[in-house]
C-alpha cells in the first residue's frame, strides 16, 4: 500500500535470520547475546546485521559488541552502561540511575529512505560521533558531530530534563557550535531534495550557522546567526505553544548585505538590503504568514535606487502589508 516506504501496519520480512544465545537468566543476573539478526523489509529497508551482548546484575547493566550494519552504513556503540542501586529503581529514574556511552560510525542517508523517502538520492555517507551521559531524569549529549566533506560539517551539544513524563515540563538546552555547508554541498542537497528544500536555499551560496535553543515544550527561545554568500541573518525568536497546540512566534530578525536580487532571481529590480525588524505573533493563516512588524530597513536597493531609513509599523497579512511606512 505504501511502496518504497515503511508502513508499521503492514510489515513484511524476507530472508529473516536470528542467532540468539542465553547464557544466564536469573533474578539478579542476565547474560545474553544477539549474535546476528538480519532481514529485508518489503519497503526496501535492509538490515544486514544487528548484534550485541548484554550483561546485567543487581547493580549495573552493560552492552558489549554492539554492531548495526546496513548496506552502506555501520554503527557501533562503545561502553553503553547503566548503574543503579537495584533493578527495582530503574523505572523511577532517580539520581541513583546513571548511564553513558558513545555512538560512532558511518551512515548513508539512502539506507534510511524507507522511513524518509526524500533521502533516496543521498548516497554519500557521513561520519557520526555522539557521546551521551545521563543521571536520573537528566540526559546530556556533550558531543554531536556529523561530517561529510561534500555537504556537511555539524558540531553541537544538547541536554534534556524531565523527558520521561514526571509531571514537570520538559526542559531543553542545545548549542549549535557550527553547521557548515559549502556551496557545492548546498547545490548537491538542493538537487537531491528538490521539492523538499525551498528553491531559495540553493541560492544562498554557502551556509555557516551558529545558534542555541533554550526552553520547554510550551515556550522555546531560539537564537542564531546565519552567514551565507548572499548575506547574513541574525534571529532571536520565542515560540509559544497554547493548550490547543497552536504555535506563534515573536522576536527580532536582522539582515546585513542581504542579496535580494539573487534570492528572488530578480537582479534587475532588487539589490542588497540591511534591516532590523521586530515580529509579534508570527504564525500561518492558510498559505500566508501573518505577523505584526515594526522596525527599520536601514538600506534597500530597488530599481537602481537606494532607499534609506525606511520605518515599518503595521501588520503583514494575506500576502500584503497594512500599516505605516
Where are these regions (language model features)?
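Interface amphipathic segments
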Residues: 1-16, 23-325
Amino acid at each position: 500500500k505504501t511502496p518504497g516506504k515503511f508502513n508499521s501496519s503492514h510489515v513484511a520480512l524476507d530472508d529473516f535470520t536470528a542467532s540468539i544465545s542465553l547464557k544466564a537468566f536469573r533474578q539478579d543476573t542476565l547474560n545474553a547475546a544477539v549474535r546476528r539478526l538480519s532481514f529485508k523489509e518489503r519497503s526496501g529497508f535492509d538490515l544486514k546485521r544487528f548484534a550485541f551482548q548484554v550483561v546485567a546484575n543487581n547493580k549495573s547493566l552493560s552492552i558489549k559488541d554492539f554492531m548495526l550494519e546496513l548496506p552502506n552504513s555501520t554503527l557501533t556503540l562503545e561502553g553503553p552502561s547503566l548503574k543503579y542501586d537495584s533493578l527495582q529503581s530503574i523505572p523511577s529514574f532517580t539520581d541513583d540511575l546513571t548511564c553513558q556511552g558513545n555512538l560512532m560510525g558511518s551512515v548513508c542517508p539512502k539506507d534510511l529512505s524507507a522511513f524518509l523517502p526524500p533521502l533516496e538520492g543521498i548516497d554519500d555517507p557521513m561520519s557520526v560521533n555522539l557521546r551521551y551521559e545521563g543521571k536520573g531524569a537528566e540526559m546530556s549529549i556533550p558531543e554531536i558531530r556529523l561530517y561529510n566533506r561534500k555537504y556537511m560539517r555539524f558540531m553541537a551539544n544538547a541536554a534534556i530534563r524531565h523527558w520521561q513524563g514526571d509531571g514537570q515540563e520538559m526542559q531543553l538546552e542545545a548549542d549549535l557550535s557550527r553547521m557548515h555547508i559549502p556551496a557545492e554541498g548546498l547545490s548537491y542537497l538542493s538537487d537531491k531534495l528538490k521539492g523538499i528544500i525551498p528553491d531559495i536555499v540553493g541560492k544562498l551560496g554557502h551556509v555557516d550557522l551558529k545558534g542555541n535553543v533554550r526552553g520547554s515544550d510550551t515556550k522555546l527561545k531560539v537564537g542564531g546567526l546565519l552567514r551565507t554568500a548572499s548575506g547574513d541573518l541574525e534571529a532571536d525568536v520565542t515560540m509559544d505553544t497554547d493548550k490547543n497546540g497552536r504555535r506563534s512566534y515573536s522576536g527580532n530578525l536582522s539582515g546585513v548585505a542581504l542579496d535580494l536580487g539573487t534570492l528572488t532571481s530578480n537582479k534587475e529590480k532588487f539589490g542588497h538590503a540591511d534591516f532590523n525588524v521586530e515580529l509579534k505573533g508570527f504564525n500561518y493563516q492558510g498559505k500566508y504568514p501573518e505577523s505584526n512588524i515594526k522596525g527599520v530597513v536601514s538600506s534597500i536597493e530597488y530599481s537602481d535606487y537606494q532607499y534609506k531609513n525606511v520605518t515599518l509599523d503595521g501588520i503583514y497579512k494575506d500576502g500584503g502589508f497594512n500599516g505605516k511606512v
